[in-house]
């Protein structure tokens, strides 16, 4: 039974949250020691990846700040800050919004860091920072697939013009989306996952 819980929580992207919940149980109700050790090792791996991403975000935000470009975090890391243990919410790519200054920012990254920027994506460009993929959004959704996306995009950009709170990531200030933008964008993102692949428990928790 515990092995099934472990495997399922891993597939659903909530392995570290399940670990946190397991700590609340009496010793007699916890899984066997061998499984706990395996679990702990993988939670530690999640934490290390989170710290790497945190450093990459801080480096990127500091670089943009030198050029007077504000940066907003979308999904991932920004959402983790709402969790009881932020570093236990796994983050994939770093999704950013630069308030319409994406083309300028990409040229700066390519010129000053020598980092190749992939422009052949649907609604963002991509590049690598310290081994972590960055998605630099010029649109929030792919406007070419559905007419409704174009209407949504106008709404996303309207909300994005007024960012939410500013938080410090390793001492560097970044913006988070407003509550309105977060709610709409996350629901849209989850709907796309549900239609194209599936929707995991991590999306529900977000």
Which residues does each PLM region occupy?
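Conserved NTP-donor binding/palm subdomain of two-metal-ion nucleotidyltransferases/polymerases, i.e.
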Residues: 1-92, 98-206
